[in-house]
Amino acid sequence: MRTRGGIVTKRRRNKWLKLAKGYWGHKSIGFKVAKQAVVKSWTYAFRDRKQLKREFRKLWIARINAAARPLGITYSRLIEGLKVANIQINRKMLSELAINYPTAFSQIVEKAKTSLAKK
């Protein structure tokens, strides 16, 4: 007599189906397709965790550049000026200053400009 898949098999399948809950169509019902969808979602999640960091850095740079240009300096010259002036501030904080505290940002820009002029 043939032995059928018992409780162990059912538990294993339900574990994968639970991870696929909310997926569209057969991806949340069929075991094989659900397992493939879950594994694929993990690869997307891994890739996009790395990509998110890149996207935010691009956003911060764009904001800094947009705020610095009316003050008469480009982004690259501003970063160079900050390095010469030995001002260690990251791009995220510079972006926050540019948006929420424009006067503080303009003071930092002026220090960067003066350090570039002395160079």
Curated annotation (Swiss-Prot):
Q: Which PROSITE patterns match?
A: RIBOSOMAL_L20
From the UniProt record, give one GO term of the biological process aspect. Answer: translation
What Pfam families does the annotation carry? Ribosomal_L20
- Give UniProt keywords alphabetically: Ribonucleoprotein, Ribosomal protein, RNA-binding, rRNA-binding
Coiled-coil stretches noted in the UniProt entry, renumbered to this chain: none
Name a single GO cellular component.
ribosome
**Single Gene Ontology MF annotation:** structural constituent of ribosome
Q: What is the purpose of this protein?
A: Binds directly to 23S ribosomal RNA and is necessary for the in vitro assembly process of the 50S ribosomal subunit. It is not involved in the protein synthesizing functions of that subunit.
- HAMAP family listed in its UniProt record: Ribosomal_bL20
Q: Which family does the entry's similarity section mention?
A: Belongs to the bacterial ribosomal protein bL20 family.
Protein name, please?
A: Large ribosomal subunit protein bL20
Organism per entry: Metamycoplasma arthritidis (strain 158L3-1) (Mycoplasma arthritidis)
